Amino acid sequence: MPVCVMMAELDEKLLLQFETQELEAPGGIATPQVYSQLLVLYLLHNDMNNARYLWKRIPQAIKTANPEMAAIWAVGQRIWQRDFPGIYSAIAAYQWSESILPVMEALRESTRRRAYGLVAQAYTSISAEDFAAFVGYSVEEAVKGVVSHGWQADPNTRMIMPQKPDPPPVSLVPNEQQLARLTDYVAFLEN
């Protein structure tokens, strides 16, 4: 089983465990560690709605007493605003605890993968400086990264030409099934 699949399953189990701990907390208020872990896992899964609602549920006293939680939420705000350079700077700006650091590193890499995918879909060419800010690398590291992805980098113009991703396979619906579906729609419209 690939490592990324195993990590995703582990993250899902951790997420469910922390959600259960929050729900079963005595008095309805969980520990700051549970809230912090749950918030950062929501961010890792890009589940911004649950992250926002969790932030609203956390008592103000816990938010103010735990600066790490505020730093996690600062990262979440940058994700919400789709401020990719801000995400990397917010992650780098805080000295994370041992329990949060691995998840933040995974979040940084996940954000980079998403940025690569977005650039590949949206751009035919992008300046090396803009791309470097978008993926949180120096210009030299960004150029090395795109070359390793099979993209082209022009050192004269300092432009990067992404390779377009392969289109997702189109699932062909058998003709009989398509005809049955069309018949159902027409029958619905007539009645």
UniProtKB/Swiss-Prot annotation:
It comes from the Eukaryota. It is found in: Cytoplasm; Nucleus. One of its GO terms (biological process) is COP9 signalosome assembly. Component of the CSN complex, probably composed of cops1, cops2, cops3, cops4, cops5, cops6, cops7, cops8 and cops9. This is COP9 signalosome complex subunit 8. Keywords: Cytoplasm, Nucleus, Signalosome. Component of the COP9 signalosome complex (CSN), a complex involved in various cellular and developmental processes. The CSN complex is an essential regulator of the ubiquitin (Ubl) conjugation pathway by mediating the deneddylation of the cullin subunits of E3 ligase complexes, leading to modify the Ubl ligase activity. Belongs to the CSN8 family. InterPro entries: COP9_CSN8, CSN8_PSD8_EIF3K, PCI_dom. It holds the Pfam family CSN8_PSD8_EIF3K. It comes from Danio rerio. Residues 6-179 form the PCI domain. GO terms for cellular component: COP9 signalosome; cytoplasm.
